Amino acid sequence: MRARGLSVAIGLLIATEALAGDPVRGRAIVADRQVGLCLLCHSGPFPEERFQGELAPSLAGAGSRWSQDELRMRLVDPARLNPNTIMPSYYKAEGLERVAPAFRGKTILSAEQIEDVVAYLATLK
């Protein structure tokens, strides 16, 4: 299971090597409650967002705490870093349970969106 997560992360890294993430788009994804859903659990530097999560660590300073590769891994396979996490994998489509038919076989975010979020989180020093 862990090897599978690592291979997904490595595959994503290779697939996105040519993609440069856009931090502006990444911020929009993180703040969008219909796309990233990050603020359901996390808080961060989003003064315009009234309700932010308290379940997970703040995103403020994420770029100081983790490298871009570590941020990517946290999005792609968070259970590899913390087996007890409740954070979903944003780039996993197989081996999931209780997935609505409309979402089966689909990732939450595309490879480009993952890179955008990584680029944004890396700016949070």
What are these regions (language model features)?
Residues 50-56:
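Short cysteine/histidine-rich zinc-coordinating motifs and their immediately flanking basic loops
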Residues 39, 60, 88:
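Cys/His/Pro-rich metal-binding microdomains
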Residues 5-17:
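Bacterial N-terminal signal peptides
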Residues 74, 90-125:
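C-terminal capping alpha-helices of c-type cytochrome domains
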Residues 1-2:
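N-terminal secretory signal peptides that target proteins for export/translocation
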Residues 15-33, 46, 57:
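Electrostatic cytochrome c docking/interface patches
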Residues 41-48, 64, 76-77, 92, ...:
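Detector for the c-type heme attachment site
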Residues 26, 34-45, 71, 117, ...:
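The canonical Cys-X-X-Cys-His
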